[in-house]
């Protein structure tokens, strides 16, 4: 009906869904909620990880830009295609899972 692929860009607090058209699906970063490390240590600004937003995707290199109260902002080294709100983001150090969170916003 729209003539082009659409994807969820943002889910607003009131439940409204913001869509975006194909071609606008590359993002330079994501914000996670309920973010935590598997070992219980805090996620700190400046740390580097690989992050996967799809289980079969290669991990994308990123830097923690900000981390506070379970909210973590990650900035990708290279823009990434179509992360979406509600998806899990898993943080890696090489092959080791270090933590993760739920995507709430794309940057």
Task: Locate the predicted segments by residue.
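AMP-forming adenylation/ATP pyrophosphatase catalytic core
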Residues: 1-107
């Amino acid at each position: 009906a729209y003539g082009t692929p659409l994807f969820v860009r943002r889910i607003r607090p009131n439940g409204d869904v913001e869509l975006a058209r194909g071609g606008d699906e590359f993002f330079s970063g994501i914000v996670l909620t309920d973010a935590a490390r598997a070992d219980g240590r805090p996620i700190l600004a400046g740390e580097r990880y690989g992050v996967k937003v799809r289980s079969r995707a290669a991990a994308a290199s990123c830097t923690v830009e900000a981390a506070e109260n379970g909210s973590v902002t990650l900035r990708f080294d290279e823009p990434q295609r179509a992360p979406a709100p509600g998806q899990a983001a898993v943080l890696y150090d090489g092959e080791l899972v270090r933590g993760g969170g739920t995507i709430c916003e794309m940057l």
